[in-house]
Amino acid sequence: MASRQSRQQHTTSAPAASRTQTETSTPSQEQPPQDPTPEVRSQPAILRLRGVRASSGPSVRWAEGVVDNEGLGRKSSKVCCIYHPTKPVGESSDESSSDSSSDSGTDSDDSTRGKGKRKHRSGGGGGGKKHGEGDCHGHNHGHDHGSSSSSGGGGGARKKKKKRTPSPNAYEKMPKVKPRAPAPEGAPGASGQ
């Protein structure tokens, strides 16, 4: 052996289930090279591992305009009852005129939908009834639809609108079924069945 090397080990402990070990080699005795070509030493490879960063907060951030429409003191991404904020009587609704069929405009229009299966409040405020008592959408999941006149849910404070033709909302629309065109004879996936 031309040179002897001693190895020292340094062990560093990290939290919980990770461990780092570093080896440092130092030559104890050095001899001059006998070859005219310099000796090529390879540096030991360094592997640095970094743990996953812990999330610093909630992954969902609600916009300022998101409303707690279930009255439970929390905001939710679950869509049960679509909330449309009330507008002052004189305010223009140009930006929402294109989607007027999806507005929850008047209570009387809603009562004509769904082949009479649903019962809706008619007229002004009234204490919010629980779902499943025959009003709203006919599903029971334990929250009030408080339609007091202060929240704008009542129909008595609204100006008379032109009655629109009833059209199903997004939850009532059935998807259009496209008829399948027969595949050409030589096309992949075409079979004689």
Curated annotation (Swiss-Prot):
Residues 1-19 have a biased composition (Polar residues). It is found in: Nucleus. Pfam families: PPI_Ypi1 (PF07491). InterPro entries: PPI_Ypi1 (IPR011107). Residues 1-193 are annotated as: Disordered. Keywords: Nucleus. Residues 20-32, 183-193 have a biased composition (Low complexity). GO terms for molecular function: protein phosphatase 1 binding; protein serine/threonine phosphatase inhibitor activity. The keyword Repeat does not apply. GO terms for cellular component: nucleus. Residues 130-146 have a biased composition (Basic and acidic residues). Regulator of type 1 phosphatases which maintains protein phosphatase activity under strict control. Belongs to the YPI1 family. This is Type 1 phosphatases regulator YPI1. It comes from Pyricularia oryzae (strain 70-15 / ATCC MYA-4617 / FGSC 8958). The gene is YPI1.
